[in-house]
UniProtKB/Swiss-Prot annotation:
It comes from Methanococcus vannielii (strain ATCC 35089 / DSM 1224 / JCM 13029 / OCM 148 / SB). The keyword tRNA processing does not apply. The lineage of its organism: Archaea, Methanobacteriati, Methanobacteriota, Methanomada group, Methanococci. Belongs to the Tfx family. The keyword Protein biosynthesis does not apply. GO terms for biological process: DNA-templated transcription initiation. GO terms for molecular function: DNA binding; DNA-binding transcription factor activity. Putative transcriptional regulator. It holds the Pfam family Sigma70_r4. This is Putative transcriptional regulatory protein Mevan_1098. Keywords: DNA-binding, Transcription, Transcription regulation. Transmembrane segments: none annotated.
Amino acid sequence: MESFLTEIQIRVLNLRKKGHTQEEIAHVMGTSRANISMVEKRARENIEKAKNTLNIYNDIIAPSKIKVEKGTDVFNIPNVIFSKSDEEEIHVNYSSLQIMEFINQNAKRYIKNRMVVEPFIITILQNGEIYVHDFEEEKAKN
C-alpha cells in the first residue's frame, strides 16, 4: 500500500508503539539515536501533513457546515447537528451523547462552563462523519 511514510519510518513508529526507546531502536537498526530521532520526527510531520490534507479535502467535499455561535449552550449542539443533517438527508453516525463527547474532545478551546465563548464550525460529511474547524480559518478561506 502506498503511504507518505517510508518503510524505515513505519518500522520506527511500530517499535516506538511497542515501548522501545530510540536508543534501543538505533542499536537494533545499526544506526545512531539521533538518526532514529530524526526519522521519527519526519514520520510524525508526514502524518500531520496527511491529516491536514484529509481535513482540506473533507472541507471541500462537505455538503453541510454549521456555524456554532458564541453563547450557544453545548447541550443544544447535537439537536442543531441532527436538524441540519436531516435537511441534507445525511445520517450522522453518532448519538447525542457521542456528539457531546466529540465536542468535548475537539472543541474544548471554544467552550467554557457549557457555553460557547468563541464561534466555531462543525462540518458534516456525506458519510455522516463530523469535524470541528476554527471559524476564523473558515472565514479566511472565503
